[in-house]
Structures are given as C-alpha cells and as structure tokens.
C-alpha cells in the first residue's frame, strides 16, 4: 500500500518576511480518497484495507523525526457504513468536510511551510493550494509519484486520490474545487517518477 508522505510543501519564497513564520506538521490521515480494498487482498477485512491510509499517517508521524514544529491533526472520520459516488467522486461530501477542516487549521495558524503526513495522495491538495494562495506566483509543485493523478470526475475510477493534481490545477468536482483557496498553473507543476503506461484518457491529458 502506498503511503504518501505529501511533503506538500516545502515551498520557499524569496521574500524574507516569510522566513519569520513557522513550519507546521500536519497529520492528515484521510483515507476516503482511495478505493483500494480490491487490491489489498492480504487484508481479510476490506473495510480495514480501505482505512489503511489512516494507520499510515499515524506510522509516518511516529517515524518522522520530531523537529520541534507545532503538530496539528485534521479530524478524519473512520466510519465506513456507506461509501457512495456523488457527481463522479467517491465519498465526495465527506472529503469536502475534511477539506474544510484542514483549511481551517491552516487559515488559523498561517504557516509558511507545511510538512504533511498522510493519508492518500489527495492530502496534498489543501497544503499546496494554501501555499499557492500565500505565495502567489512564487511557488511551484513537484509531484513525485508513479501516477500523474490527473483523473477527473466521470472517468472510470472515481477515487479522489487519483484527482489530486487536477484539483490543484482547479479542475474537477465543483463542490470540492470551490473550497480550495487557489490553483496552480500546469506550467508550474513538475512530475517525477511517472510510469510509462496509463489509461488512454490519462495519456491524452499528459
């Protein structure tokens, strides 16, 4: 299971005023963006497999060295009583609620840098778009992943973790995108580690 450490974001500005602000550690154990149980067959209970990302965030927090940053945890529900696709996104309404909760933390603390420990790939969306809003044109995103995560609602795979980069670009489900504080131009996104095979619609977008 891929446990994405969304190093969302050591976006550094040349403007020295931001150097006075602090780095925070954001524990973001969101799992609803993934739909992975069918691939994790070694876990007998599919619900436990689905929630594996939640445990992954706790493990990363335990393993990552403590550098003295303030630490905040985004409240994430572990309820899995009903998973449903809404407007092309699995568990959309839960993701919207948790997106708001993450943004509330950032808007109150106003960090200059964020170390995000997740969680599936979509935990990068809130930190990156927060930093894009804070630094305006002085920020870029390096996406290190085997997948480009440029899926859109309506594609064959409805899980939001595969839509993370398109969400950062301001594309995707309107209810989610409307919560995000900024978008990142495709010209400021660098992909590293992308595999050389993808579904046809992904190849076209790349």
Where do the model's predicted regions map?
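Sec-dependent signal peptide recognition
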Residues: 1-9
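Repetitive helical segments and hydrophobic/amphipathic motifs
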Residues: 11-13
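Sec/Tat signal peptide C-region and signal peptidase I cleavage site
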Residues: 15-19
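Conserved alpha-helical scaffold segments that buttress catalytic/binding sites
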Residues: 21-206
């Amino acid at each position: 299971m891929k446990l994405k450490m969304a190093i969302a974001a050591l976006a550094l500005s040349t403007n020295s005023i931001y150097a006075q602000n602090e780095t925070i550690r954001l524990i973001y154990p969101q799992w609803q963006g993934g739909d992975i149980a069918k691939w994790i067959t070694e876990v007998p209970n599919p619900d436990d497999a689905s929630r594996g990302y939640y445990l992954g965030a706790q493990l990363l927090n335990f393993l990552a060295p403590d550098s003295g940053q303030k630490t905040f945890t985004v409240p994430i529900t572990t309820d899995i009583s009903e998973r449903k696709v809404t407007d092309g996104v699995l568990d959309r309404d839960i993701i919207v609620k948790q997106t708001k909760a993450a943004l509330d933390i950032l808007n109150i603390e106003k960090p200059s840098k964020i170390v995000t420990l997740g969680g599936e790939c979509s935990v990068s969306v809130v930190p990156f778009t927060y930093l894009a809003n804070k630094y305006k044109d002085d920020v870029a995103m390096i996406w290190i992943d085997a997948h480009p995560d440029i899926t859109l609602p309506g594609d064959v795979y409805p899980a939001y973790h595969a839509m993370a980069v398109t969400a950062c670009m301001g594309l995707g489900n309107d209810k989610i995108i409307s919560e995000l504080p900024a978008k990142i131009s495709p010209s400021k996104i660098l992909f590293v580690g992308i595999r050389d095979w993808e579904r046809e619609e992904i190849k076209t977008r790349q």
